[in-house]
Amino acid sequence: MIKEEIKVYENSQALSEGFTGFLQKLLDVYPHVNLSLSGGTTPKALFDYWSANCRDTIDWSRISFFWGDERCVPPEDVMNNFGMTKEHLFDNIPEIPANNIHRIHGENEPEEEAQWYSRVLNIDVPLRNGIPSFEIMMLGLGDDGHT
């Protein structure tokens, strides 16, 4: 098990390098990593970093992508977190298997989608004490302090 740590980085480049190093450590320990994503400018910078620097250095087949939040808009909307991830990561790294991408369908009726995604998480993510447990959960922090 990887030791839990809180790290603070000076800029998005340093964060991208540090996050990538942590991901590589997890891939050294676990056969498969479940990664929960968020939207925002920091993840976008990380996805751009991965697209430019990590296409051939990360075993993308061993990572499953989920989302911790999504807006109730279709993926073509600029506010959609999956759409941003697709544009800045998935479209640039075709080695990421489509069946490893588990998006929230923001275009669907919210309550039904929340119930559907809950089932997805309970089936596709290992449970710890009955709760889906991710190896990495990326949380955004807005200017107003929201997560």
State where each predicted segment sits:
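Ligand-binding beta-strand-loop-alpha-helix segment within the catalytic cores
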Residues: 1-3, 59-138
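N-terminal glycine-/serine-/threonine-rich phosphate-binding loop
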Residues: 1-35, 111
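Short, conserved beta-strand segments within well-ordered enzyme catalytic domains
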Residues: 34-38, 64-67
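Glycine-rich beta-strand-to-loop/alpha-helix junction loops that act as flexible
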Residues: 37-42, 139-143
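Short active-site-proximal "capping" loops at secondary-structure junctions
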Residues: 40-44, 71-72
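Active-site catalytic pocket residues across diverse enzymes, especially alpha/beta-hydrolases
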Residues: 50-55, 93
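Anionic-ligand binding region
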Residues: 132-135, 143-147
